[in-house]
């Protein structure tokens, strides 16, 4: 154990002698544990919260969260107004000091960077005990700095580039920067997404991301009308009106419409909102005989009832008029068998079909044969040749 402790002390002394003073070898710090680093931070981070009142309002851009996306405008104001606090920047948490232009006797950015480089190996060479002793101090500093306004950290190289960009036209590195600056100037970005507002927190940001999926719910509390973007309620009303207009175009029938209108809707555009309209969706399978007064639909053969008086017509029996019967009897008296040519002529003359003419003549011959059988059977053999001649065309 003694060898290990001696080795640890020798290694500790090796690192601490080269980078630390004698009073800081074993974790003993002067005063209240505040190092020179905190004294340097006092130049840059003012502990007076009322000091922020010196900043002009409105700032550019007029949003507190915009410095996360655009650090150029805030750096210009920091060069003009010294002492404006940058509380929870990473440089204050890790022990670095943010560079600042040399004004009113303050150190320049190059000197602060050199001091930061000297202090970084000191922090690396500290033992775990010393780091644990510094942790509560750093946590207290962070708690004091949290209530102040959050801003973005810029390094010396970025500051030099931003000074060059002041003379040159601004070129944005990403679309988010351009959208954020455009909203700050009062322009609406191409995507149509509303800007970030002062009171907007992470919950409101999530609600903003899910806004297109919940257009039906008005979200006027987000304050989108301040920047010239139309209100969500107006968008919802326009969406509702367009939906009603689309329903009128699709041909959804009114409540009292007959079922015939439902039958002819297949010729129009597809009905998208028909199933979502209660009271207007009538089943197309209603019986046409029970329809209300209005346009009477034509009675097709497949619509006729299979029972009742219409059952006799199912046999297809044709009723001939007295004129048609008289003309057919005349033709049968002169010729009991018809040729095809004569059959066509009679069909056109009597407004009948060839099949009807053929069937009538067949029935008439059978009737005539029965009449001859009943009159005298001895003469039926001689009359048989007249009934069915051998060369009669059928």
UniProtKB/Swiss-Prot annotation:
Keywords: Developmental protein, DNA-binding, Homeobox, Nucleus, Repeat
Primary subcellular site in the record, as a coarse category: nucleus
InterPro entries in alphabetical order: Antp_homeobox, HD, HD_metazoa, Homeobox_antennapedia, Homeobox_Antennapedia_CS, Homeobox_CS, Homeodomain-like_sf
Ranges annotated as biased composition (Polar residues): 44-53, 88-106
Region (Disordered): 44-135, 256-300, 368-394
Low complexity composition-biased segments: 71-83, 111-135, 258-297
Protein localization: Nucleus
UniProt DNA-binding region: 313-372
Family: Belongs to the Antp homeobox family.
Name of protein: Homeotic protein antennapedia
Lineage, broadest ranks: Eukaryota, Metazoa, Ecdysozoa, Arthropoda, Hexapoda
Gene: Antp
């Amino acid at each position: 154990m003694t060898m290990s402790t001696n080795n640890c002390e020798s290694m500790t002394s090796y690192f601490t002698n080269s980078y630390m003073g004698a009073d800081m070898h074993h974790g003993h710090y002067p005063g209240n544990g505040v190092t020179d680093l905190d004294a340097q931070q006092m130049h840059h981070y003012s502990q007076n919260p009322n000091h922020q009142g010196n900043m002009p309002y409105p700032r550019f851009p007029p949003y507190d969260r915009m410095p996360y996306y655009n650090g150029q405008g805030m750096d210009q104001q920091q060069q003009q107004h010294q002492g404006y606090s940058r509380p929870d920047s990473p440089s204050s948490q890790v022990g670095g000091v943010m560079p600042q232009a040399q004004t009113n006797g303050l150190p320049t950015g190059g000197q602060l960077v050199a001091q930061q480089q000297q202090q970084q190996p000191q922090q690396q060479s500290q033992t775990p005990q010393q780091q644990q002793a510094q942790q509560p101090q750093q946590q207290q500093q962070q708690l004091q700095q949290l209530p102040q306004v959050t801003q973005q950290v810029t390094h010396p190289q970025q500051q030099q580039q931003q000074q060059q960009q002041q003379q040159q036209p601004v070129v944005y590195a990403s679309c988010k920067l351009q959208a954020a600056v455009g909203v700050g100037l009062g322009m609406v970005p191409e995507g149509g997404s509303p800007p970030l507002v002062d009171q907007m927190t992470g919950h409101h940001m999530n609600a903003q991301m899910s806004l297109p999926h919940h257009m039906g719910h008005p979200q006027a509390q987000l304050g989108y009308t301040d920047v010239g973007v139309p209100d969500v309620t107006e968008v919802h009303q326009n969406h509702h009106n367009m939906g009603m207009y689309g329903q009128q175009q699709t041909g959804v029938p009114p409540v009292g419409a007959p079922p015939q209108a439902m039958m002819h809707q297949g010729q129009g555009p597809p009905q998208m909102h028909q199933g979502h309209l209660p009271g207007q969706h009538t089943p197309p399978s209603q019986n046409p005989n029970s329809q209300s007064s209005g346009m009477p639909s034509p009675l097709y053969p497949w619509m006729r009832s299979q029972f009742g008086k219409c059952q006799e017509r199912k046999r297809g029996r044709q009723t001939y008029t007295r004129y048609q019967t008289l003309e057919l009897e005349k033709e049968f008296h002169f010729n009991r068998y018809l040729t095809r040519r004569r059959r066509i002529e009679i069909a056109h003359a009597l407004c009948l079909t060839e099949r009807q003419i053929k069937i009538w003549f067949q029935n008439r011959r059978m009737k005539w044969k029965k009449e001859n059988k009943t009159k005298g059977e001895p003469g039926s053999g001689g009359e048989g040749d007249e009934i069915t001649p051998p060369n009669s065309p059928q």
